[in-house]
Amino acid sequence: MSLQTNHRPVLVVDFGAQYAQLIARRVREAGIYSEVIPHTATADDVRAKNAAALVLSGGPSSVYAEGAPSLDAEILDLGLPVFGICYGFQAMTHALGGTVANTGKREYGRTDINVAGGVLHEGLEACHKVWMSHGDAVSEAPEGFVVTASSEGAPVAAFENKERKMAGVQYHPEVLHSPHGQAVLTRFLTEIAGLEQNWTAANIAEELIEKVREQIGEDGRAICGLSGGVDSAVAGALVQRAIGDRLTCVFVDHGLLRAGEREQVEKDFVAATGAKLVTVDERQAFLSKLAGVTEPEAKRKAIGAEFIRSFERAVAGVLEEAPEGSTVDFLVQGTLYPDVVESGGGSGTANIKSHHNVGGLPDDVEFKLVEPLRDLFKDEVRAVGRELGLPEEIVGRQPFPGPGLGIRIIGEVTEERLETLRHADLIARTELTAAGLDGVIWQCPVVLLADVRSVGVQGDGRTYGHPIVLRPVSSEDAMTADWTRLPYEVLEKISTRITNEVPDVNRVVLDVTSKPPGTIEWE
């Protein structure tokens, strides 16, 4: 069961753009709830959602191409405010009787637009930069629409019809390369559509707690698998606030954690929430399963399978200790909105992917899922966590893979190698925090090349130690990422400390590969 919000959504119609989720996030950053729906949605689907407004996303096609995605024409007759972006701007124009033409002037990248009045660009420079990505262009606006911007390749780069509460732009306001884009989107939502900005962390937390309370009921009991990450911690905190000690949190220590993570869960999380916590020490079980395993996918499968078995044992223990006559019927998961959209759940179809921190469960244990975060993006989860009083060490934590340090050791995973990597990782994290860079990077995997020996000189002799790789990346959603340009003095400090303080390491290297082509994790 999902916990649907009471807010009327702004529906972002996805025409196949890579930016549909980003648009939805930008709408929420404006303080208004949003959801993504496919362009195949009908007017009846939109009515059923009780939409507050529509935003039509960009897309890869020409509106004249065979099989080009189109919009149910009836949707534009529902009387809802509509904002078109790039392809969505052209599709809207086409549907409303305007003209979309192949001008022969393509625009890709930063482009100057010239503004001529209107609500969207009021107070902005008469000529300013935006991010364009189009071949066709609107040459004539639909009847009743006022043209408010143009560029060299787009005679109609923006238009508005305040009476119908409709507007659109040829450029991409949702990307950071359009410096005024967020202001333009917000103006549509608030000044043209007339929507209230009431999607805040405080409102979200209060609403979700009440929804959880309704779903689980007055006597229901729940289990939450904690991974040490942000999502499961915030999900657990929300449910604990809703049902108190009828929630049991389970934390499996698989021995592949970073320094201090078990203690952080056992002390900081419990202190902040008052949650009942069961910790299961499975370190030796995982190490024995990983003995001799070097192939990355085999490692992941071994870790995943053992985690399922460990969680099963922990769940069995919780069920045995439940008060006589009571049952534990609910399982809390930290599913986020991107998981829902990517699995097809955004259209009300398909099943939701299970989280790696829970995995499978025994056939004879059937839980009802509680997914309090399934309508939220990662930045909103962090904001709700802060609202619930979770410490910054938890809510500001960098993403960390389910298989843990096991996939950051290139080669066989052993206790000795884990200690080496744990030490190096702690130094890197400590120095990045001290330099105030935690908010700059998305994450910084630290990788041990355990099957590589590097010649070095330490003291007066030659050494054969292992290299450590630093992989700092910047990203908004982990779908794409760029390597972070860290200050040289910070890199120098990390390198010096690691080679001086971590035994058997004599070289530190920097990974400067973007994603694509390289993934964020090495394995």
Swiss-Prot record:
- Could you tell me which residue ranges the Glutamine amidotransferase type-1 domain spans? 9-198
Task: Name the Pfam families on file.
Answer: GATase, GMP_synt_C, NAD_synthase
Residues the entry annotates as binding ATP = S227, G228, G229, V230, D231, S232, A233
- What Enzyme Commission number(s) apply to this enzyme? 6.3.5.2
Superkingdom, taxonomy of origin: Bacteria
Q: Which UniProt keywords apply?
A: ATP-binding, Glutamine amidotransferase, GMP biosynthesis, Ligase, Nucleotide-binding, Purine biosynthesis
Pathway this chain belongs to? Purine metabolism; GMP biosynthesis; GMP from XMP (L-Gln route): step 1/1
Name the chemical reaction catalysed here.
XMP + L-glutamine + ATP + H2O = GMP + L-glutamate + AMP + diphosphate + 2 H(+)
Cite the active-site annotation: C86 (nucleophile), H172, E174
Q: CDD domains of this UniProt entry?
A: GATase1_GMP_Synthase, GMP_synthase_C
TM helices/strands, residue ranges: none
Entry GO MF terms: ATP binding; GMP synthase activity
| Name of the featured protein | GMP synthase [glutamine-hydrolyzing]
Q: Which organism is it from?
A: Corynebacterium glutamicum (strain R)
